[in-house]
Amino acid sequence: WDYINSVSDAMAWDQFFINPNIESIGMTYGYMKNYEDRVRRAVNTPDSKGNYALWQGGMEPNIPVGSTEGVSASMEKALAGAERELKEGASGKWVAHWKMVHIVRPVWEKSGKANQMGRSFEKLSYTQEDADGLIHLDSAPRTIRGARNLLSVGLQYGNAFGQGMQAAALKPADFFGNDNVLYLMEDMATGEIRLSILW
């Protein structure tokens, strides 16, 4: 996820590199998909002694409090994300809210394996196509509301951090009062990523 910040900073000089609305940048989006693929292949490549690292999946930021429809839709999305990560080779996942444990843990329990260390993956390659994939922008919406959302959550996190909180439950101000849009747990990466995308 933090790769959004890295690639946005690295490409800040390029006037044609404009990220879409942050809601579109999931782990299956353009450069994120290619980045994750390289990570999983690198992590699952043994060292000179045959030892493997453990690839842990991403963080599930949903806080399951809201309308029935909103919670249901978010849980379906979280479950699909966990199942995708298991398929891709992750050995687990971490959650921002304890209520999410019973949603994602069964995904790995039903696999019947303690982890996926040593799973065979295609070896890393270092081609121009690989490099281009790490900055690839898929077609996705770029709207004023998207910019407002970036700014809104970034300012909210700055306020929370200034009060001594390292993490906070946030959502864009445009959705205050809309219980179909859940709060997400945000941390310092939120400020870095959102500011990087904005500039």
Predicted regions and their residues:
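Conserved alpha/beta-domain cores
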Residues: 1-199
